[in-house]
Amino acid sequence: MIKNSKKTTPVLVSGALGRMGSEVVNSVLNSSDCELVAAIDTNKKNNGENISQLLNLKKSDVLVSNDLEGSLCSISQDYRNEKIKPVLVDFTHPDSVYENTRSAIAYGISPVVGTTGLTPSQINDLAIFAQKANIGCAIIPNFSVGMVLLQQAASVAAKFYDNIELIEMHHNQKADSPSGTCIKTAEMIEEYPKKYNQSLVEESESLKGVRGGVRDSGLNIHSIRLPGLLAHQVVIMGSPGETYTIKHDTIDRKAYMPGVLQAIRKIGKFNSLIYGLEKLIF
């Protein structure tokens, strides 16, 4: 563990050897106002190895640890009297993200969560826990500024369209469907309350689920998983005589890093849970 000697935000990265985690490590190492203090990953064969050497990144003395709990405890003690509090960035797995986030809050460390798959009940539990602990916690389904703008546009347009379909496409290593980003988009559309996609005919499906998953509001969501994709979302709205399509493509994980760094810098100003990058940038 490294003790922060400057006025920088101490950052722990959980899932540090993964695709997103390694990008976060690189961005933190190259940031002037953040400092990497712990790199946690479940890959046991790399335990104790230097993170910079493993990922061929800017020099750092941080060693990979398999022990999230131990890292949280140690960093919490190291910075208990510091004005700038540590932040845990989590890009792990839907099966572990809830416990990881809860543990960080328990140790007084603000979580910035990019892992999707949290249920509404889990998010509500974390919100209550964060508020009681007086700790900022950010649940961010998508760190792309472009995606946030898509969601804002879709939310505004929903007032004018009764028929809306959402398509989300990701690489075939993504575990959860639909994506947290797409769920967030649907929730923002549903802020204008009405029943969407009311059928004018009696529909039948010769292949079950071919029309996609249907939310209580009537919004249809279609999930695609293919090699060669990264992260893509399309919102298609239709009315007589026209369609309106909003599309966002992420072609490199670097697109997420400005949003991640913004969340790291700002979450310390909050004392409760926030959901969505728009809460930080607008």
From Swiss-Prot:
The gene is dapB. InterPro entries: DapB_C, DapB_N, DapB_N_CS, DHDPR_bac, NAD(P)-bd_dom_sf. Its EC number is 1.17.1.8. It is an enzyme of class 1 (oxidoreductase). NAD(+) binds at G15, A16, L17, G18, R19, M20, G114, T115, T116. HAMAP family: DapB. This is 4-hydroxy-tetrahydrodipicolinate reductase. Pathway: Amino-acid biosynthesis; L-lysine biosynthesis via DAP pathway; (S)-tetrahydrodipicolinate from L-aspartate: step 4/4. It catalyses: (S)-2,3,4,5-tetrahydrodipicolinate + NAD(+) + H2O = (2S,4S)-4-hydroxy-2,3,4,5-tetrahydrodipicolinate + NADH + H(+); (S)-2,3,4,5-tetrahydrodipicolinate + NADP(+) + H2O = (2S,4S)-4-hydroxy-2,3,4,5-tetrahydrodipicolinate + NADPH + H(+).
